[in-house]
Amino acid sequence: MATHLPTASIITIGDELLIGQTIDTNSAFIAQELNRIGIWVRRRVAVGDQAEEIRNALDQEAMKSDLILITGGLGPTADDMTKPLLCDYFGGKLVRDESVLKHIEYLFQEVYRRPGALLERNKRQADVPDVCE
């Protein structure tokens, strides 16, 4: 009897990836780790910061893979709309994860040594879709 390996698709988001401004090392690392635990990565897809492109990638990969991992499009800038888009797509809402917020505060205070520089846009990095696992 043949066994079915779980399958995954990795979607990377960001115009900077498409134009070569940033090298995508995240999806390579994720693919290696998934392979190590017995999950077959069937596709790695890069899309820009356009809502329609992200939705299309989600639609296509959801039909073919057991698991979809998304990386990128999560910075504190205005064009990073991945989290609100995912909430809309999956029917959830953004909630602030206090443990993530504490980590961000730690980074600003202890690592960057800029405690007063923590802005609301940085705090929004701790907002996560309540429907994602």
What are these regions (language model features)?
Residues S65:
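An anion/phosphate-binding loop that grips the pyrophosphate of nucleotide cofactors and donors
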Residues E53-N56, M81-E133:
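Proline/glycine-rich low-complexity loops and linkers
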